[in-house]
């Protein structure tokens, strides 16, 4: 049975344990988050005036990499076909001064730069920059600008430390300071590594003897971080729905072949 347990949730990240799965599923979830969860990003720019020191192409690339808020409640982001919807982000600026992402004017108030303080270009006295940028829904598999964030996972492991190891109390104290669960018996302590835990060098000689590491079968610790386009919990939810939809489509195609 698949189980999820949230370890830590912040406005821009979430850490959780998923149990009862294998490596292919864990990697499929990671790849789906990175390559299949759609977001808005600038896909085309029409320059009307550019007196800045940067070529049009450089500014267009910078605009494309600005994370744009994506209203998940308005679009079927878990659908296999994306909505054909375009948002216009306009700018008319004159130097001197720095042009920031927050200066962009959006035709849709729900689709705008997630961070208004991203610098785009610095204009000198008398320089002007005017353009219309067009943002569309896309997927990370087509371009990194559509990736909703970052995701990585590790095996859930347990470190068994025998009380015969000199200064084992030091490891217990270190693990507790890191916020790691520690179980203690008469013979040993067991540290569950829900996040990175590195042994001090003085204990390395005891690895494989008084200290051993155990991989918990079928359990993985995931960390997902959002760029700001989507709430981090929605990224995971949408990715799981996409996985289910693709699996259903695959099964249906198999049934057609069987018939």
From Swiss-Prot:
GO terms for molecular function: DNA binding; DNA-directed RNA polymerase activity; protein dimerization activity. It is found in: Cytoplasm. Disulfide bonds: none annotated. It comes from the Archaea. CDD domains: RNAP_D. Its EC number is 2.7.7.6. It catalyses: RNA(n) + a ribonucleoside 5'-triphosphate = RNA(n+1) + diphosphate. Pfam families: RNA_pol_A_bac (PF01000), RNA_pol_L (PF01193). Keywords: Cytoplasm, DNA-directed RNA polymerase, Nucleotidyltransferase, Transcription, Transferase. One of its GO terms (cellular component) is cytoplasm. InterPro entries: DNA-dir_RNA_pol_30-40kDasu_CS (IPR001514), DNA-dir_RNA_pol_insert (IPR011262), DNA-dir_RNA_pol_RpoA/D/Rpb3 (IPR011263), RBP11-like (IPR036603), RNAP_Rpo3/Rpb3/RPAC1 (IPR022842), RNApol_insert_sf (IPR036643), Rpo3/RPB3_RNA_Pol_subunit (IPR050518). The keyword Transferase applies. PROSITE patterns: RNA_POL_D_30KD. The keyword Nucleotidyltransferase applies. Part of the RNA polymerase complex. This is DNA-directed RNA polymerase subunit Rpo3. It comes from Thermococcus kodakarensis (strain ATCC BAA-918 / JCM 12380 / KOD1).
């Amino acid at each position: 049975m698949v189980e999820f347990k949230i370890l830590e949730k912040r406005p821009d990240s979430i850490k959780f344990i998923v149990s009862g799965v294998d490596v292919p599923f864990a990697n499929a979830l990671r790849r789906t988050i990175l390559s299949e969860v759609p977001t808005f990003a600038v896909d085309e720019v029409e320059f009307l005036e550019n007196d800045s020191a940067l070529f049009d192409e450089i500014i267009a690339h910078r605009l494309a990499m600005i994370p744009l808020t994506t209203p998940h409640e308005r679009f079927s982001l878990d659908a296999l076909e994306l909505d054909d919807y375009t948002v216009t982000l306009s700018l008319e600026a004159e130097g001197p001064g720095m042009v920031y992402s927050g200066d962009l004017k959006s035709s849709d108030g729900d689709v705008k730069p997630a961070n208004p303080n991203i610098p785009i270009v610095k204009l000198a006295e008398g320089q002007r920059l005017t353009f219309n940028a067009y943002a569309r829904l896309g997927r990370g598999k087509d371009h990194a600008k559509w990736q909703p964030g970052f995701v990585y996972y590790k095996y859930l492991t347990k470190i068994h430390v025998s009380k015969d190891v000199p200064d084992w109390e030091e490891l217990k104290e270190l693990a507790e300071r890191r916020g790691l669960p520690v179980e203690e018996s008469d013979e040993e302590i067991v540290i569950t590594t829900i996040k990175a835990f590195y042994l001090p060098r003085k204990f390395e000689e005891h690895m494989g003897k008084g200290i051993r590491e155990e991989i918990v079968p079928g359990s993985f610790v995931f960390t997902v971080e959002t760029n700001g386009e989507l709430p981090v919990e929605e990224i995971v939810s949408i990715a799981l729905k996409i996985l289910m939809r693709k699996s259903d489509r695959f099964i249906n195609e198999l049934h057609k072949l069987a018939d």
